[in-house]
């Protein structure tokens, strides 16, 4: 995989030479585990299954849980998504609706964001405390598959190691608007030039290298399917004209890259202590009374 200076001009190239060593150092310390931390969200057989998924995720960068959320919760999440995105067209993507403040919009989403088993996997992967930092509900209407802009092209998320959970709230097939992920690309340290703006796009790198095809996995499955992935790995959205795709995407961070997330105080206060700690570890919560 090409990891040199992105074609962003001489200024970016020079900045990359100066800033890359500092970026590598920060990311190295970000990835170091906390030896005093151990996730304790589940026990027994569930803990063993979570541990196996953690090992797979460390190896591949992504794990899939087909049909993980089931009725009646699945129906509640689907209803919450409909309420959250209705009347909210996505300004950055055509034929799409989204709500970046999903937890504020509907408390039902906490049942997915703070699911014990998913938290066990995330905690096992990070090996340190972590918090929810974004929760985005999205509905993609049919659009031409040739649309390859923004997150609908091969890229990494420019913030180093970062765990995302994507919950499919509609059936998604290999012919639909699925996400694709390049397995075993998640441990890369990107230089400064390939961590900023257009430099984080790897569309040409992936498309022009046929040997990578066998490492590409597709996030498909029935509604309720969950993908847990490290967004430092290369991934891409894909548009298509055959299916509507509905998803809830949650981002969890540890130590770095906390973002503002709007939450209702009464919803946080109603959480069990351990789950409340996951939310309140984010110092940038925006409290809405």
Which role fits each region the language model picked out?
Residues 2-4, 18-19, 39, 187-289:
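Conserved double-stranded beta-helix
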Residues 69-71, 139-140, 159, 172-174, ...:
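Short, solvent-exposed loop/turn segments at secondary-structure junctions
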Residues 80-81, 181-183:
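Short Gly/aromatic-enriched secondary-structure transition segments
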Residues 2-60, 64-156, 194:
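Non-heme Fe(II)-dependent double-stranded beta-helix
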Residues 128-130, 134-136, 150-152, 161-167, ...:
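Generic beta-strand structural signal
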Residues 159-174, 220-221, 228, 251-254:
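Short, conserved beta-strand element in jelly-roll/cupin
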């Amino acid at each position: 995989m090409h990891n040199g200076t992105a074609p962003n001009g001489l200024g970016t190239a020079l900045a990359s030479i100066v800033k890359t060593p500092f970026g590598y150092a920060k990311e190295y310390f970000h990835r170091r585990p906390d030896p005093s931390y151990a996730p304790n969200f589940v026990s027994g057989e569930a803990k063993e299954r979570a541990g196996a998924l953690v090992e797979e995720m460390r190896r591949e960068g992504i794990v899939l849980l087909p049909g993980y959320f089931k009725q009646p919760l699945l129906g509640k999440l689907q209803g919450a998504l409909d309420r959250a995105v209705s009347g909210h067209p996505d300004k950055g993507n055509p034929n799409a609706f989204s709500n970046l403040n999903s937890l504020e919009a509907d408390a039902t989403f906490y049942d997915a964001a703070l699911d014990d088993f998913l938290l066990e996997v995330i905690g096992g992967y990070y090996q340190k405390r972590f918090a929810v930092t974004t929760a985005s509900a999205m509905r993609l209407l049919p659009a031409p598959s040739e649309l390859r802009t923004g997150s609908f092209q091969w890229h990494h998320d420019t913030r180093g190691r970062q765990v995302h959970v994507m919950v499919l709230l509609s059936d998604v097939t290999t012919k639909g608007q699925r996400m694709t992920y390049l397995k075993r690309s998640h441990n890369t340290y990107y230089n400064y030039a390939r961590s900023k703006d257009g430099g984080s796009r790897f569309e040409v790198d992936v498309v022009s290298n046929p040997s990578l095809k066998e490492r590409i996995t597709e996030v498909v499955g029935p509604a309720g399917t969950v993908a847990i992935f490290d967004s430092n790995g290369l991934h891409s959205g894909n548009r298509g004209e055959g299916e509507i795709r509905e998803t809830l995407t949650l981002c969890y961070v540890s130590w770095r890259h906390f973002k503002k997330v709007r939450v209702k105080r009464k919803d946080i206060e109603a959480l069990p202590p351990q789950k409340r700690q996951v939310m309140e570890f984010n110092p940038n919560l925006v409290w809405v009374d």
